[in-house]
Amino acid sequence: MDGIKKKMIAMKLEKENAMERAVQYEELLKKKEEEREKRESEIAELNNKMKQAQIDCDEAQETLQEQMNKLEETDKRATNAEAEVAAMTRRIRLLEEDLEVSSSRLTETLTKLEEASKTAEESERGRKDLEIRSIADDERLNQLEDQQKEAKYIAEDADRKYDEAARKLAIAEVDFERAEARLEAAESKIVELEEELRVVGNNMKALEISEQESAQREESYEETIRDLTERLKAAEQRATEAERQVSKLQNEVDHLEDDLLAEKERYKALSGELDQTFAELTGY
């Protein structure tokens, strides 16, 4: 019985440990929520960078348009200068130099525009990656919340079963003690009846020696013997019934021990699943 009580105490401690782990998982959920908010902030920052990159791209396009306009103006000036080749040779040379400078600037502008486009593409890819990771984190958080609810339900169910097992065990202990008392009383009664039979046997021997006893007394003694014999049989039956009751109570106690052991194994399996989930979250 002490072993069963110790097992019950151990189950209570395991239940409390399961509740503590549930609290730890709630704290882990809060931490994951904070990480998700941080990532959303990073996504917003990337969006701002993309907007700035778009602004830079627009400015580069405006610069390119200005350079194209200047190039068209230079072509017009060169066309007009062809009519005055002799007089405008030096001026044409200067315009050609301006054209080379403009072309160089145009090339630089196009290079910057290409770099800005690459930066915008990289920012878009980074934003999509963060969105995917945020979705995965949300799914993981939902799964963890479901596991936490299941753990609480199992802990409550185990607590109810523990109370029911303790109640049945207390009843079984009372019945067992009563059966033991009845068995002791039956054994005492058997001894008493055996002593009475011994006395009756001695009396019968005395009656056999004393043949002068009346037939009425002899019949009375025979009736007493039959009565005592019936009482002995009844006592033996009660003793047998008491032994059967004790065996039945012992089987119930064994069954309760098996139930307690099964609940302990269930707690152990649940603890392993929760620890594995926590390890996966930590590794993630």
Curated annotation (Swiss-Prot):
What PROSITE patterns has UniProt attached to this entry?
TROPOMYOSIN
Entry-linked Pfam families: Tropomyosin
Q: Mind telling me which SUPFAM superfamilies this protein's record contains?
A: Tropomyosin
* Cross-referenced InterPro entries: Tropomyosin
Q: Where is this region: Disordered?
A: 111-131
Question: What stretch or stretches form a coiled coil here?
Answer: 1-284
Keywords recorded for this protein, A-Z: Coiled coil, Repeat
Give yes or no: UniProt keyword Repeat. Answer: yes
Q: Describe the subunit structure.
A: Homodimer.
Assigned protein family: Belongs to the tropomyosin family.
Query: What function is annotated for this protein?
Result: Tropomyosin, in association with the troponin complex, plays a central role in the calcium dependent regulation of muscle contraction.
Q: Which PANTHER family match?
A: TROPOMYOSIN
Any notes on this protein's domains? Answer: The molecule is in a coiled coil structure that is formed by 2 polypeptide chains. The sequence exhibits a prominent seven-residues periodicity.
Descriptive protein name: Tropomyosin-1
- UniProt source species: Schistosoma mansoni
